[in-house]
Amino acid sequence: MLRAIFYKEWLKTRWYYLVAVLLSLSFVGYVLLNFFRAAGLKGIAHLWEVMLLRDAVFVDLLQFVPLVVGLLFAVVQFVPEMQRKCLKLTLHLPCPELRMIGAMLLYGGLLLGGLFAVSLGVLFVAFRAVLAPELVRHILLTAAPWYAAGIAAYLLAAWICLEPTWRRRLLYGAVAACVLRLFFLAPAPEAYDGFLPWLTLCTLCTASWSWWSVVRFKEGRQD
């Protein structure tokens, strides 16, 4: 059954996911292109100096890319479920409802997690060729909360999309905005080092919120 659910979700999201992969990696490529162009013009030693003295990370352009990718993934995956009344049929399949919704969220989380891991992996390989391990770690730890925000945005947007009433959607949207703001409160590089485990836990906890919306949907709540 899990394979069937994954296949159903893949049919809905495959084209968006392809576009998301291309755009995400294009942004990563653009960041690296700018970095190596600057290295060619001014020398890699100058960039080392800038990173050490000015706390630069050279990946600021990526800050909101995972957030947008995760948000739109949830919209593409769950809005058709609500508009076409497919969720009611999905919940009547011979599979526990909680497991069904969990599988749908797991599908999205795995695809986004894979994309974000590849993006960070490309950054690691490219920067590791010319920078010290400590500087590479500095860059990746600075970017890590942004990618965690992408997963959180996906889970929170799913929670909102599955909610059957517009009044609650607006309320949930305000709550989601406050939660996502936590990932961008501190602009300084590596500002979240000590808080990163708590951000990860917060992200995982939001996965359960969609079940509240599904329960309300089953109860027939509507505007």
Regions found by a protein language model. Give the residues of each.
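Hydrophobic alpha-helical transmembrane segments
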Residues: 1-64, 76, 80-81, 162, ...
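Alpha-helical transmembrane segments of multi-pass membrane proteins
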Residues: 7, 11-15, 19, 98-115
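Secretory targeting signals
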Residues: 24, 28-32, 36-39, 43-70, ...
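Helix-loop-helix units of permease transmembrane domains in multi-pass membrane transporters
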Residues: 77-107
